[in-house]
């Protein structure tokens, strides 16, 4: 039978392992941010790219997506840009066109965002 102490130790070890994996993943994603900004600006004529959300504020986990706000991205190329970013990051991306964002989201982007 498993004791309460053993269970606590196991849960703590699993939690530490999840945090470590999340941090490794976050560092890998952060390393791709300059490339993402270059793609959006050079290939898709965006004028500004801003990181926001869990990767920007340090609350990311192993399931977090990459949240990017973009100014000047033509709506006609939005899905092409999104596909390129998902391929680059190897996972989900929330690409927000500033021109279409709700005021509450714009406020959040302004408060926590990091220009790339």
Label the model's feature ranges.
Residues 1-47, 57-62, 72-116:
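Catalytic core of pol beta-like nucleotidyltransferases
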Residues 51-54:
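Glycine-rich beta-strand-to-loop/alpha-helix junction loops that act as flexible
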């Amino acid at each position: 039978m498993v004791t309460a102490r053993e269970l606590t130790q196991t849960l703590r070890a699993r939690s530490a392992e999840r945090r470590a994996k999340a941090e490794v993943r976050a560092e890998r994603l952060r390393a791709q941010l300059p490339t993402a900004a270059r793609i959006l600006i050079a290939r898709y004529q965006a004028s500004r790219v801003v990181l926001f959300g869990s990767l920007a504020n340090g609350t990311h986990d192993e399931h977090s997506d990459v949240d990017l706000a973009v100014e000047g991205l033509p709506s006609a190329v939005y899905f092409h840009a999104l596909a390129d970013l998902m391929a680059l990051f190897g996972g989900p991306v929330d690409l927000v066109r500033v021109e279409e964002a709700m005021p509450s989201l714009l406020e959040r982007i302004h408060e926590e965002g990091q220009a790339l």
